[in-house]
Amino acid sequence: MLIDGKIVECEFEYTKCFSEFYENEDIIRFRDNQLIDMYYHNYTYIKKAMSKIELKSIIQDEISLRLSEKSKFCNILLSSDFNSSLMSTIKYNAEISTNGYYSFDISYFSRLNALSGCIIKKVNNEEMVDDILFCDLQHDEKNLGKDFCTRRCYRRGKVYVSDKGVNSYVCYHKGDIIGNCDLFMYNGIAKIEDFAVNPIYQRKGYGIIILKSLIDIAIKENSHTIYLVTDEDDTAKEMYKKIGFNKIGERADLFFQL
C-alpha cells in the first residue's frame, strides 16, 4: 500500500527539523550529530520501487557507510512493496517491522468526546521540556534507560522551543502531567507524532482529549490532511481506527544491528 507523495514529503520535512540530510534520486539519508543513537533521526529512506538487485546494492552500501561511521546500527525505511526473501542474501540480519499511516476523517471531529478540566499547553520553555522528560521517563526509562531518554528529550526540546516548526504540547489535569504529543504542519498536511499518555492515566479518556486538541489546532491552521504513523503490531492502532483514523499506506522498516 503506497503512501501519498505529499505525506512522504511531510515526513522528510519533519525529520529535517532535527537532522542534516543528503539526497539523490534513489534515497534521502538523515543524520543528527547531536543524537547519533536516535534511530529515527538517523536513517535512510528508499524513495522509489526498484529491482531486487538494485535494492540489495543500496542496502549493502548503506550498511557499509554506517560501519565506516562507527555506528552500531543501520535503519532503512521503504514504502514500496518489499520482498523479505531479499534479506537472506544480506550479511547482517534485519529486524523488520511494518508501520501504518493513518489519516483522520475530519467528519469524525464532532464525535470526539473529551474530558473536561484538562489544559493543553504548547511547549515554549525549558521548564515544560522537563515536563516532557517526566512523561518520557514514565514510558521509556525501563526499556531505553534514563540517560538516553534525557538526551533525546533535551535534543528534541531545542527544536520545540525554536521556530523550526515542530511543536510539542503537554496535557495537564489538576496540576498533574497527563501526557504529551507533537504536531508538525507542512503545506496543508499535519503530522501527529510522539503521542503518549502516562501509564497511570491510560484508558481513561485522556488520550482522546490530547488528540482532539491537536486535530483542532491543525484544522484551524487549514490542514486538509491530518495523519499519524503507528507500528502495525501496536494495539494503539485499534483506538485510532475507532476514533476516525483510516489506514492510507504502510512502510517497511529494516533495522540492522551492526
Q: What is each model feature region?
A:
Residues 1-69, 81-82:
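N-terminal charged segments
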Residues 2-9, 49, 108-155, 172:
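Short amphipathic alpha-helix that is part of the acyltransferase structural core
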Residues 14-22, 70-72, 98, 158-169, ...:
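A short helix-loop-beta-strand connector motif used in the catalytic cores of GNAT acetyltransferases and
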Residues 54-127, 254-256:
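Acyl-donor-binding surface of acyltransferase catalytic domains
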Residues 55-62, 194-197, 203-218, 242:
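Conserved acetyl-CoA-binding loop-helix of GNAT-fold acetyltransferases
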Residues 69-79, 218-230:
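Conserved GNAT acetyl-CoA-binding A-motif
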Residues 82-96, 208, 232-250:
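Conserved active-site alpha-helix within GNAT-family acetyltransferase domains
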Residues 149-196:
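A conserved beta-strand-loop-helix scaffold within acyl/acetyltransferase catalytic domains
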